[in-house]
């Protein structure tokens, strides 16, 4: 007569199912953590589900640091803390931890301990395919969660193509720039020259009313005259200060106009594209793919007097005469000599005051 087969499972990851188990997830986890094993536990995930007959079941994934050779089929038995009852599991070695984790996630009532240990079994022919992994990443809702999904379900792609994946997810989960809220109402700028007011009425508006080729404006004046605050109070805009950042985190193709503030004209990239309100142009980035700019919106250039700031002085340089002839056809140049406001009209808006008082 053949000897009964002795129980033995030698695996790094275990999948346990406890049928008709009344323990809570927390009670089960506490007992599992007390089990003495020759290799450290790295991760435990427990799911509690109710079957059609109303009986509770527990599913568990246990990951060890190294292989655990289990020869006792009662090793993982659990006991009730309140009554004389033992719960015996079905024990299997988990060939793919990712697949087991996905399976026990299906009901949502889960408890985790430790850090999940990624394996590549799914990508080598398990239930999970690359398309499934990327579909799950897209449905994650957030970039950080999508990266976690790809790291777990497509680890090879995560390591070899991280740069492209990261860049693509920035596009998929693009976060629009937060709308700017001016601390001052436009009406509080009561010393604005007629020349500026007229320019605004002709060029700053939504796309339906905007001229096909708006005219830009260069405003030169001393510091603390209100140039920046006035320019930013006119409507939805892109604000580029000190240098140009045309990434989608900063630059919106839906803005009504651009504000370029305190950028030395000698080093202003895309001078003509901005000043000429040009449409459909590209900006090459140092480490990324070219950025497509919709364009067709005017730009307010703000500067102080001086050779490293003034657009007028820059265009008056002998080498820039051709550029100057082009610029005066595409922009107006205004020099202001006094603040655009009176002190009594520079109280913040009520909305801004509320924010300040709460801070």
Swiss-Prot record:
Per UniProt, the short sequence motif RCR-1 occupies residue numbers: 15-18
Q: Look up the domain of life of the source.
A: Viruses
Q: For this chain's UniProt record, which GO biological process terms are given?
A: DNA replication
Q: Which UniProt keywords apply?
A: ATP-binding, Covalent protein-DNA linkage, DNA replication, DNA-binding, Endonuclease, Helicase, Host nucleus, Host-virus interaction, Hydrolase, Metal-binding, Multifunctional enzyme, Nuclease, Nucleotide-binding, Nucleotidyltransferase, Transferase
Q: Which Gene3D superfamilies match?
A: 3.40.1310.20
What EC number is given for this enzyme? 2.7.7.-, 3.1.21.-
Coiled coil stretches, renumbered: none
Annotated residues for binding of a divalent metal cation = 49, 57, 59, 107
UniProt free text on domains: There are 3 rolling circle replication (RCR) motifs. RCR-2 is probably involved in metal coordination. RCR-3 is required for phosphodiester bond cleavage for initiation of RCR.
Subunit details: Homooligomer. Interacts with the replication enhancer protein (REn). Interacts with host retinoblastoma-related protein 1 (RBR1), and may thereby induce the transcription of host replicative enzymes even if the cell is not dividing anymore. Interacts with host PCNA. Interacts with host SCE1 protein.
Q: What is this protein called?
A: Replication-associated protein
């Amino acid at each position: 007569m053949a000897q009964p087969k002795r129980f033995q499972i030698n695996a790094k990851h275990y999948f346990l199912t406890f049928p008709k188990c009344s323990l809570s997830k927390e009670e089960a986890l506490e007992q599992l953590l007390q089990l003495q094993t020759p290799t450290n536990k790295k991760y435990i995930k427990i799911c509690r589900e109710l079957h059609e007959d109303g009986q509770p079941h527990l599913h568990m994934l246990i990951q060890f640091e190294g292989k655990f050779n289990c020869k006792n089929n009662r090793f993982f038995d659990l006991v009730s803390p309140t009554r004389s009852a033992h719960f015996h599991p079905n024990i299997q070695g988990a060939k793919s931890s990712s697949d087991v984790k996905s399976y026990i996630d299906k009901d949502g009532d889960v408890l985790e301990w430790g850090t999940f240990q990624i394996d590549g079994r799914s990508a080598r022919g398990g239930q999970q395919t690359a398309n499934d992994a990327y579909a799950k990443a897209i449905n994650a809702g957030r970039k950080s969660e999508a990266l976690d999904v790809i790291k777990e379900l497509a680890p090879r792609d995560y390591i070899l193509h991280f740069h492209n994946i990261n860049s693509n997810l920035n596009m998929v989960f693009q976060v629009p720039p937060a709308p700017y809220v001016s601390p001052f109402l436009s009406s509080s700028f009561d010393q604005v020259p007629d020349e500026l007011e007229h320019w605004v009425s002709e060029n700053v508006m939504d796309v339906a009313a905007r001229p096909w080729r708006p005219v830009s404006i260069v405003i030169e004046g001393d510091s603390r005259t209100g140039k920046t605050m006035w320019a930013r109070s006119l409507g939805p805009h892109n604000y580029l200060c000190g240098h140009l950042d045309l990434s989608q985190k900063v630059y919106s193709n839906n803005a009504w106009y651009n504000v370029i503030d305190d950028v030395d004209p000698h080093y202003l990239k895309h001078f003509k594209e901005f000043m000429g309100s040009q449409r459909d142009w590209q900006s090459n980035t140092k480490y990324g793919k070219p950025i497509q700019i919709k364009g067709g919106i005017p730009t307010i250039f703000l500067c102080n007097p001086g050779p490293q700031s003034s657009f007028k002085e820059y265009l008056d340089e002998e080498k820039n005469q051709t550029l100057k002839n082009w610029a005066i056809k595409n922009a107006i140049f205004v020099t202001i000599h006094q603040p655009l406001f009176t002190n009594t009209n520079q109280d913040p808006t009520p909305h801004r005051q509320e924010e300040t008082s709460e801070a």
